[in-house]
Amino acid sequence: MTPQEEKELLLRVVLRIAQTQLEKGGFIPFGATLGPGREAQLLMPTSAKREITIDKVVAYWKVQMSKAIETSKITTLCTVTDVRIPDNDGKLIPGVFIHIEHWAGDAEDILFPYTKDENAKVTLQEPAKEATNLQFFVTSDDSSRH
């Protein structure tokens, strides 16, 4: 699989999980990894505080992803968070925010705004994507990587 195909596979897995959990009432931030055998592993915190800061979430995932990178040959990883973002009028709208990385040096932040109807069905909207810096994998000139 190409790096892009690996990222797309992991995105499909985590989006399905996020959508299902949102329809059941929501989810706490979670992570996922993909190994060379196309095996996805979920990383679920055992608990989370209701009003947690983004800095604490980032620090938590740095520790968890570092452990995952050290203990297995993962190629792709991501973190998934249910967020509220301001629209053009300043009204807060719900979204699924995903930070995804590939060990080859590719990283993206992706935001999927979503709507929820009266039957709790969640519909993901067109995502906004932005290339970003790696947060969890080491830089591409480090020869110690896979």
Task: Spell out what each predicted region is.
Residues 5-8, 23, 32, 39, ...:
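Glutamate identity and glutamate-enriched acidic tracts
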Residues 1-64:
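N-terminal domain-onset segments
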Residues 71-146:
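Low-complexity intrinsically disordered segments
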Residues 49-86:
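Mature extracytoplasmic domains of secretory-pathway proteins
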